[in-house]
């Protein structure tokens, strides 16, 4: 079917009376060089436009088995009709574009046999906004082939030269030099002289599917550099089931403004880089309306599908009046789905989210900590002037250590324009031990049978309460002030020690309930911080400069029963540096110290702590130590740490079949730690990942001595 469509599209060029093939008088390299030079100019040609977009989606089940009926339980997976072999959806939307990559698509009308929001969300609208002259797609999913910077990833062949209406054209085929989800294969036709692309076809791979898209550019001067017709094919294959989809799009431009090529005014506001807006489905079922406005006539098969759907609707309505069992079955399926997937609900101005009790994405694994399991719940109530109240609840369990963690955080976002918020948080944190305990064990009992490695981290269980306020003084500069209150309770289980003092004196006085009341101030500064707005809510995006964090805390003795008095100061610097295409380098440097310790204290740092359920950086693995023993996080009153991560789509796996098909990111890790006790601890790592999961292999070294090797995996939502 794909080949047939391609022939139909090319037919006007090869069937014209004045159309004939000829041998090109230009080398392929020259044609490519001129086309790529023109692409750099055409990429920045359009300043803005508005358009009406018609999209018709037809999906068909090619092959299925008994597992097919459970496909709808997988969220955001594949567009299909669980009750029929095929389905049709039609949409009309308004598309607005602003240079360089701001797309806002408002869906105005929807009709067809699948009209739920979850079905509309699976239509690949993002492929309609591909700029064939760009280096990458807007979401950086693919490297486009018509640029000098991406040419090193492709091989090109001049397939055909021909003339039509006294114009010469070149049909160029391209293939990737190795398999990778970031690379396409396909062809494009360029016009000699203007060197613009008149037709583009690309094919790509995903984990469970493959797809192709065809773009035909306009034939009027104002649309010569913009697509007017797009066809997208998708095929999903999983567990013996095969589903195919075809999406036809027609774009009718209303207004187009070209750029004046003047120096743009600098702005850090990058709101709405790409957004499809569909708060509720604007269902419009008037047959006469669609017959009048539909730019692409329905095919016979599509007419049959729609007529069958209308007949089924009548039958269902009759059944509903006489039997409620059908509704009960659907309710049971709905409940089962919510058990295994991340789900969200909306009621008036309130939104709820739940991770799903049996959701496999809530599982994690590391060779040191074993299997971890977590649950998340969220609630947000919208108020006037874009204000809101958010509640996030978290619970996690580590099976190997039999430890339970919780957190309940409530935030009142009272000034969204200035990131003003007040937050209250409480929960159960990492088990820990006090400085008094460590000092006495290490300094006084070292010769009596207890070594540092014998300490059990279950001596103190940490219950924390945190109240703080955050406010933006100016763009990129945030101030946070608050109070940390900890209650640390020991299990008073002295037998957990592997030995006692020689004279049998108990050391129970080292245990009990300890409290700390610590006001703190935190300053976060990012120079030239880019941001965007969603309504009145300001959201930080990126910056070309590092982010600096400074935090100072002082624990006050005898306030709310506090037994500690100390000062803590920490400095943290982090940055993500993008270079090349989809390559990045991230670093994170931190230093901290407890000073003026006048009493017993717990060496719990903010930026150097055990994260049992990591969500650092973009991969869930980097930015922390993956193999470091948790006993060493609290073993010193100071630390100096550094982490770096290099990410690229092409490192080691690019020439390995199968693996390179699904792993579109590779990462190298290096972490270094220095404390007065550890001196030098290092971790080296290598990781792979995609949008579903990330996994890494790490090796640990103490000074120059190899310690251990381990793995860690994190799943993406």
Residue ranges and their predicted role:
Residues 60-66, 202-206, 238-242, 362-365, ...:
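Flexible, membrane-facing loop/turn or short amphipathic-helix motifs
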Residues 143-145, 157-158, 167-275, 590:
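Gly/Pro-enriched, hydrophobic low-complexity segments
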């Amino acid at each position: 079917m794909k080949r047939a469509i391609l022939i139909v599209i090319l037919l006007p060029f090869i069937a014209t009376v004045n159309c004939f093939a000829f041998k090109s008088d230009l080398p392929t390299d020259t044609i490519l060089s001129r086309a790529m030079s023109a692409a750099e100019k055409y990429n920045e040609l359009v300043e803005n436009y508005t358009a009406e977009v018609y999209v018709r989606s037809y999906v068909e089940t090619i092959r299925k088995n008994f597992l097919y009926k459970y496909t709808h339980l997988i969220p955001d997976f594949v567009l299909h009709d669980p009750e029929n072999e095929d389905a049709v959806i039609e949409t009309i939307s308004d598309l607005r574009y602003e240079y360089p990559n701001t797309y806002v698509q408002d869906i105005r009308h929807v009709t067809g046999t699948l009209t739920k929001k979850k079905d509309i969300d699976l239509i690949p609208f993002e492929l309609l906004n591909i700029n064939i002259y760009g280096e990458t797609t807007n979401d950086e999913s693919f490297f486009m082939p018509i640029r000098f910077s991406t040419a090193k990833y492709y091989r090109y062949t001049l397939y055909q030269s021909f003339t039509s209406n006294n114009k010469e054209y070149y049909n160029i085929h391209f293939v990737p030099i190795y398999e990778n989800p970031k690379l396409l294969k396909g062809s494009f036709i360029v016009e000699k002289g203007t060197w613009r692309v008149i037709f583009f076809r690309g094919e790509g791979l995903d984990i469970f599917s493959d797809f192709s898209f065809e773009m035909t550019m306009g034939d009027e001067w104002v649309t010569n550099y913009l697509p007017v017709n797009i066809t997208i094919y998708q095929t999903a294959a999983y567990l013996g089931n095969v589903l195919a989809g075809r999406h036809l799009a027609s774009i009718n431009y209303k207004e187009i403004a070209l750029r004046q090529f003047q120096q743009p005014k600098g702005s850090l506001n990058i709101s709405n880089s790409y957004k499809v807006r569909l708060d509720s489905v604007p269902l419009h079922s008037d047959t006469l309306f669609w017959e009048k406005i539909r730019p692409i006539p329905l095919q016979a098969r599509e007419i049959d599908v729609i007529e069958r759907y209308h007949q089924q609707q009548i039958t269902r309505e009759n059944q509903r009046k006489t039997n409620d069992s059908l509704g009960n079955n659907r309710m049971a399926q709905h409940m089962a789905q919510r058990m295994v997937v991340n789900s969200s609900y909306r009621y008036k101005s309130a939104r709820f989210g739940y991770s799903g009790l049996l959701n496999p994405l809530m599982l994690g694994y590391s060779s040191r900590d074993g299997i971890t399991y977590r649950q998340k719940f969220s609630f947000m109530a919208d108020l006037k002037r874009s204000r809101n109240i958010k509640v996030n609840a978290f619970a996690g369990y580590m099976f190997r250590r039999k430890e339970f963690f919780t957190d309940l955080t409530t935030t009142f976002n009272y000034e969204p324009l200035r990131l003003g918020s007040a937050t209250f948080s409480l929960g159960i944190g990492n088990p820990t031990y006090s400085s008094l305990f460590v000092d006495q064990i290490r300094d006084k009992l070292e010769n009596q049978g207890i070594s540092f490695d014998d300490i059990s981290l279950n001596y103190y269980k940490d219950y924390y309460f945190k109240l703080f306020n955050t406010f933006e003084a100016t763009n990129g500069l945030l101030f946070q002030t608050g109070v940390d209150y900890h209650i640390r309770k020991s299990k008073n289980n002295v037998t957990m020690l592997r030995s006692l003092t020689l004279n049998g004196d108990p050391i129970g006085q080292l245990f009990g309930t300890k409290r700390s009341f610590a006001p703190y101030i935190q300053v976060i500064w990012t120079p030239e911080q880019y941001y965007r707005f969603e309504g009145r809510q300001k959201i930080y995006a990126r910056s070309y400069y590092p982010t600096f964090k400074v935090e100072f805390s002082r624990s006050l003795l005898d306030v709310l029963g506090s037994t500690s008095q100390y000062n803590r100061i920490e400095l943290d610097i982090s940055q993500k540096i993008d270079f090349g295409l989809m390559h990045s380098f991230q670093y994170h440097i931190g230093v901290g110290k407890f000073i003026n310790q006048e009493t017993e204290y717990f060496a719990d740092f903010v930026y150097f702590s055990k994260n049992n359920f990591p969500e650092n950086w973009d991969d869930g693995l980097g930015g922390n130590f993956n193999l470091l023993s948790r006993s060493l996080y609290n073993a010193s009153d100071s630390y100096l740490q550094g982490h770096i991560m290099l990410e690229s789509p092409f490192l080691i796996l690019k020439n390995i079949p199968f693996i390179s098909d699904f792993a579109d990111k590779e990462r190298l890790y290096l972490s270094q730690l220095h404390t007065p006790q550890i001196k030098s601890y290092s971790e080296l790592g290598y990781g792979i990942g995609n949008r579903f999961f990330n996994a890494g292999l790490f090796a640990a070294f103490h000074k120059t001595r190899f310690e251990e090797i381990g793995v860690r995996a994190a799943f993406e939502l």
